């Protein structure tokens, strides 16, 4: 009886071992094939296409199940009725929201534009022309330079302080850059020694008396038009001035009865001060827009819709206390009304030192993807004289350029990378460097995007590019603060914002760190998402708050929430956050409500990991078109029960929306598989069981474990 029961048990086990794989194979595999067949969208004339994007970066995002206007892409692993469109609009919006440090719309504010358009009458009304000739071809800079020079001369300290604070070129050097008219007219003290032979080369004026209309009148004579006959007549001049400025001078006016210059008097000073008080805010606002990449072409102000997407990295060497070294690395993409890139630039500026810098600009040649570019390598000392060492030009393909840029540019290099990959989180984040290569800093990669037939001397061009790459490499060797660092200042839509992001570079897909800092009225708001892990302790940025992300339409912040501040601040601001320990919906949106001010902050973030796609593809880790999935295992045959059951678990992870802690689930399942197989391998190694029986029993155990996981979902 026992023998027959034992045989019956073995028969049941074998039967289940044969049937279950067919069930899992039939139930899961066809669904998977239907789910992950993506339609290739044509992108002719639209810029980067789907293949380019997939090759550009590896990312995975939670899906906004409740679609919002700020959601620009979806997770292909989740069921949705939305079409997958990989076009320029989608791609640029993603870059703008995920990486950019600012967006500037290329349109000046109406008040400042009115100053430009009405300048002919304004300069007379406010008597600006008595002090300085503001040139319209360089209107913004010339106007700021005049206001600063006037403020310094007439001790308008609040005005000069605001300009130093907001205008980059005055932060390092506080000296006025232009002379006022009265400073350009130098009084000649020793009249007898005036060099009359330079009258044709320089401008002299003399104040003298003439008999006119039966009375003596004081007049100004321009010696180029009315030179004195000899030195004998010089004694008849009350005063002689020499023009020391640039350009054609404007003769001052005098009182015909006294001979005194009436320009620059107290009344005229008052009128100019009125203009400065009226215009300073608009002028500085416009300057900020231009500093962030906006156009100063006021002759063509109707470029409605054009904008500049800015990727700005500012570094400061704080170790050099006496002479703080500062460098700015900036990329700007200019986009037209059709959301197509029409031009762009990359620039490394080293300020207050003589390190080499470079500028690389490009512009669309027509409707295609061919762009002309120009580059130069230069140095400057104290932001004054520029010295160019090398210059080059050529053409490249924009799509390939963006692909190379964003595929290889953002590659964090962690010191404890292996530990991070194993555990899926960073308890103490420590890394040697974060490599941000705007050109991928590999000459071979950059040469791949060039249209080489347009390069006359390829060898010389390679040499020039290598020089630029070395400069850029030195920049990132010396400095650590990049987009991945905290406290990155940027100016967006009228207020200062700080933004930092730490991304993972391991097998785990979901990053667990996000940092955001903003100024709300007088309150400094800081949001963190770190799952109670210590956050960037190297520089001691403080404790970590655990805020939640949510995508539900019925999101109620009063549920499972806490107050950011207690006591009086709680009553004043009413700022709440949702507790992450009790609510783990998704990783897309977090909200912060300022209830007392009847205002709400809602920031959207895309949860993604960044990989170097070239390394992944070369290693064969993620085949093309399956970059978003946990990869399926290819069974050796219908009898490969382990592969079928593993594929069933992978299907759950890849397909079902709302899987809680999907990364931990995937990690946990993998560890269980590893543990179970290890356990039975040791047993069967000792007892030498039949391999077929070993496989069957193992897979039944795995199926039981799998069902346990399913019940937890």
Swiss-Prot record:
Span-the-membrane segments of this chain are 686-706
Q: Which controlled-vocabulary keywords does the entry list?
A: Host membrane, Membrane, Transmembrane, Transmembrane helix
Q: How does it sit in the membrane?
A: Single-pass membrane protein
UniProt cross-references to InterPro entries, sorted A to Z: Phage_1-C74_Orf1
Where does this chain mainly localize?
host cell
Q: Name one GO cellular component term.
A: membrane
Q: Where in the cell is it found?
A: Host membrane
Q: Does the keyword Transmembrane helix apply?
A: yes
Specify the superkingdom: Viruses
The family assignment reads: Belongs to the plectrovirus ORF1 family.
Q: What is this protein called?
A: Uncharacterized protein ORF1
Per the UniProt record, the source organism is Spiroplasma virus SpV1-C74 (SpV1)
């Amino acid at each position: 009886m026992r023998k027959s029961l034992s045989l019956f048990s073995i028969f049941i086990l074998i039967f289940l071992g044969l049937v279950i794989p067919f069930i899992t194979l039939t139930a899961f595999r066809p669904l998977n094939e239907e789910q992950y067949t993506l339609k290739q969208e044509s992108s002719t004339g639209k810029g980067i296409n789907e293949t380019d994007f997939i090759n550009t970066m590896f990312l995975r995002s939670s899906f906004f199940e409740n679609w919002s206007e700020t959601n620009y892409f979806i997770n292909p692993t989740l069921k949705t009725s939305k079409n997958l469109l990989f076009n320029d609009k989608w791609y640029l919006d993603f870059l703008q929201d995920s990486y950019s440090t600012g967006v500037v719309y290329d349109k000046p504010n109406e008040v400042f534009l009115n100053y430009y358009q009405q300048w002919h009458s304004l300069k007379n009304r406010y008597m600006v022309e008595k002090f300085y000739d503001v040139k319209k071809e360089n209107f913004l800079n010339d106007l700021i330079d005049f206001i600063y020079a006037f403020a310094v001369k007439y001790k308008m300290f609040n005005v000069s302080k605001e300009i130093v604070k907001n205008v980059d070129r005055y932060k390092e050097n506080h000296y006025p850059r232009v002379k006022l008219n009265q400073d350009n007219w130098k009084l000649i003290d020793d009249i007898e020694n005036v060099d009359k032979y330079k009258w044709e080369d320089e401008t002299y004026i003399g104040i003298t008396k003439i008999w006119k209309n039966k009375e003596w009148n004081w007049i100004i004579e321009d010696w180029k038009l009315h030179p004195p006959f000899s030195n004998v007549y010089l004694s008849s001049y009350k005063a002689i001035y020499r023009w020391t400025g640039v350009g054609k001078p404007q003769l001052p006016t005098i009182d015909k009865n006294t001979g005194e210059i009436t320009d620059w008097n107290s009344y005229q000073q008052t009128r100019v001060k009125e203009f400065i008080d009226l215009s300073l805010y608009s002028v500085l606002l416009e300057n900020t827009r231009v500093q962030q990449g906006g156009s100063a072409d006021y002759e063509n102000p109707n470029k409605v819709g054009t904008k500049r997407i800015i990727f700005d990295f500012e570094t400061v060497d704080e170790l050099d206390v006496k002479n703080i070294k500062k460098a700015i690395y900036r990329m700007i993409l200019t986009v037209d009304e059709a959301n197509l890139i029409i031009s762009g630039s990359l620039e490394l500026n080293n300020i207050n030192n003589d390190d080499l810098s470079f500028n690389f600009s490009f512009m669309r040649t027509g409707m295609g993807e061919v762009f002309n570019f120009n580059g130069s390598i230069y140095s400057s000392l104290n932001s004054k004289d520029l010295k160019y060492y090398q210059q080059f030009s050529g053409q490249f393909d924009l799509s390939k350029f963006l692909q190379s840029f964003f595929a290889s540019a953002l590659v964090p290099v962690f010191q404890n990378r292996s530990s991070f990959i194993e555990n899926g989180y960073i308890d103490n984040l420590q890394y040697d460097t974060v490599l941000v290569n705007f050109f991928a800093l590999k000459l071979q990669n950059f040469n791949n995007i060039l249209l080489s037939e347009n390069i006359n001397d390829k060898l010389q061009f390679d040499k020039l590019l290598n020089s630029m790459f070395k400069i850029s490499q030195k920049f990132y060797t010396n400095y650590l603060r990049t987009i991945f660092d905290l406290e990155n200042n940027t100016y967006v839509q009228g207020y200062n914002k700080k933004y930092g992001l730490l991304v993972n570079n391991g097998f785990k897909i979901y990053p667990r760190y996000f940092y955001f800092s903003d100024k709300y009225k007088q309150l400094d708001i800081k949001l963190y998402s770190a799952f109670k892990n210590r956050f960037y302790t190297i520089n001691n940025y403080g404790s970590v708050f655990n805020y939640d992300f949510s995508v539900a339409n019925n999101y109620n912040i009063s549920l499972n929430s806490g107050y950011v501040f207690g006591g009086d601040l709680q009553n004043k601001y009413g700022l709440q956050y949702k507790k992450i320990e009790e609510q783990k919906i998704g990783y897309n949106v977090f909200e912060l409500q300022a209830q007392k001010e009847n205002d709400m902050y809602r920031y959207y973030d895309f949860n993604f990991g960044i990989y170097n796609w070239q390394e992944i593809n070369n290693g064969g880790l993620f085949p093309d078109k399956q970059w978003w999935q946990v990869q399926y295992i290819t069974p050796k045959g219908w009898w490969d029960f382990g592969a079928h059951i593993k594929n069933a678990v992978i299907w759950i992870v890849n397909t079902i929306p709302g899987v809680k802690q999907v990364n931990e689930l995937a990690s946990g399942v993998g560890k269980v598989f590893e543990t179970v197989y290890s356990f039975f391998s040791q047993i069967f190694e000792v007892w030498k069981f039949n391999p077929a029986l070993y496989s069957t029993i193992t897979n039944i155990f795995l199926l039981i474990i799998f069902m346990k996981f399913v019940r937890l979902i």
